[in-house]
Amino acid sequence: MSAIYLLRKISTKTPSRFHRSLFFSTFSKDSPPDLSRTTSIRHLSSSQRFVSSSIYCFPQSKILPNRFSEKTTGISVRQFSTSVETNLSDKSFERIHVQSDAILERIHKNEEEVETVSIGSEKVVREESEAEKEAWRILENAVVRYCGSPVGTVAANDPGDKMPLNYDQVFIRDFVPSALAFLLKGEGDIVRNFLLHTLQLQSWEKTVDCYSPGQGLMPASFKVRTVALDENTTEEVLDPDFGESAIGRVAPVDSGLWWIILLRAYGKITGDFSLQERIDVQTGIKLIMNLCLADGFDMFPTLLVTDGSCMIDRRMGIHGHPLEIQSLFYSALRCSREMLSVNDSSKDLVRAINNRLSALSFHIREYYWVDIKKINEIYRYKTEEYSTDATNKFNIYPEQIPPWLMDWIPEQGGYLLGNLQPAHMDFRFFTLGNFWSIVSSLATPKQNEAILNLIEAKWDDIIGNMPLKICYPALEYDDWRIITGSDPKNTPWSYHNSGSWPTLLWQFTLACMKMGRPELAEKALAVAEKRLLADRWPEYYDTRSGKFIGKQSRLYQTWTVAGFLTSKLLLANPEMASLLFWEEDYELLDICACGLRKSDRKKCSRVAAKTQILVR
């Protein structure tokens, strides 16, 4: 831990990038930060100490109540922080200037906000709706400051909530749509600060019952706390949660994956690649990848995780190889391959990433895909096959096909399974995993089309009165009692058990725009916009059609607001949206490390994956 910390602290030189010409970061020419202003934890009394992973600085500040572009008094983190570079530009948060063919400006005119979209020489002026104006106010009020600089947004900022629990913390997964909204608005400092501060938290000690998880683990969330040093002096500290305080004490597997995805998005949108080229950032990427690619007992290229290790953070029967984790894992692998500098210390890791990408894409495309043809194939499966050429490789019993699926799946649609393990297929439709399979090209082009066809055909089930179902259908009766343990929060058609989550809008929008079907996203966004403002931006909605606000739903949920705004900005800026998704990588189909083509076996992942592209 100390070696990694020292490396990040002294790193001043950036390595060359892979797939691009040399590009070196520009560091501040000012005098170095005054680190004497910081205070070590050992100076605090035992009653004042927090967890050992806390980071300290001045002055006292937490949530910024107004627009955080306004000047504040006190010492800025730029003067002495080791994790945030000095000499950052003070961008106005009243204006956007996106460097692309489409230029979006947000100006104040007669106290009304107007959006100007310039495409070529044509200009179209569109006044922001009341919902958009309110959403920006809520998002900006949710910003958290640390040492005078914005570092994230709280999960929810409901003034009527007397017991916020951990909703007053900055969650990595929750901040992603907020970060994209700010980036698309031309405000990158908050995202840069967030990435660097969470990177420092990565290498700090985390322990549950005297056991420490992998070194590359990113926290699920962090909180800015203020501690008193004496009667007149206070100090701010970053207090991370790696799962030791979470319900069920589950490590956040998706946090590191989201961090890598956001790091790439920051570079793509801002054009500032110096951040990802820093030695400490390169080290952070390697730690996450090494943790994900570590050898184990698993026979599959998918990541093996426990229940509750992602957005669905309560017991919902997704332990094993859930699609959400696999699609984010695949995206993070592609991001890492793009951002890692190739040298003697990283070439083995890059080779391992390439091999894993090839194996993972084949595995998901071949075994997770479900359409009417595949269901009929499973329906006729023979079981107990013992052979390398077995058709039913996972020994799936046809009786596992749920009755609802037979009549539900459309003729022209399909989707990726929620989970796959020996003798087990989870036939539920999980939206986030399927959306990111489209965005990252984990699924084939024809599979991507079929997923959107299914959503269009089953609009009332997936969208209903509020987009979008987190999964479909709900676990009910004995399934709910056995699989969730009778969880009172995950009752049928509520919360993670097929509740409707508006934050998923931005991911649906990105998937639709990639496939050239933005009208689907616009239709869903129109459904949400009718209700979100009046309902005070709830976290989730209940009932089969999403008609009621969730029974335990927090109001003024930040990622609900951010998901709505990001969807609006993506639709208005298709050039920017194109920076956030991946096209099919045909080079991956030529990578095969298994050596099966030299044996008597009939199929290897390279040949089979190419068949998936050209035939399906």
From Swiss-Prot:
Its main location: mitochondrion. Expressed in seedlings, roots and flowers. GO terms for cellular component: mitochondrion. One of its GO terms (biological process) is sucrose catabolic process. The keyword Ion transport does not apply. Disruption phenotype: Reduced primary root length and number of lateral roots. Reduced plant growth, delayed flowering, increased expression of antioxidant genes under basal conditions and reduced oxygen consumption in the dark. Keywords: Carbohydrate metabolism, Glycosidase, Hydrolase, Mitochondrion, Phosphoprotein, Transit peptide. InterPro entries: 6-hairpin_glycosidase_sf, 6hp_glycosidase-like_sf, Glyco_hydro_100. Induction: By hydrogen peroxide (H(2)O(2)). One of its GO terms (molecular function) is sucrose alpha-glucosidase activity. It is found in: Mitochondrion. Residues 1-78 form a transit peptide. Pfam families: Glyco_hydro_100 (PF12899). The keyword Lipid biosynthesis does not apply. Optimum pH is 9.5. The modification Phosphoserine is found at S92, S605. It catalyses: Hydrolysis of terminal non-reducing beta-D-fructofuranoside residues in beta-D-fructofuranosides. Its EC number is 3.2.1.26. Belongs to the glycosyl hydrolase 100 family. PANTHER family: ALKALINE_NEUTRAL INVERTASE A, MITOCHONDRIAL, PTHR31916. Mitochondrial invertase that cleaves sucrose into glucose and fructose and is involved in the regulation of multiple tissue development and floral transition. May generate glucose as a substrate for mitochondria-associated hexokinase, contributing to mitochondrial reactive oxygen species homeostasis. This is Alkaline/neutral invertase A, mitochondrial.
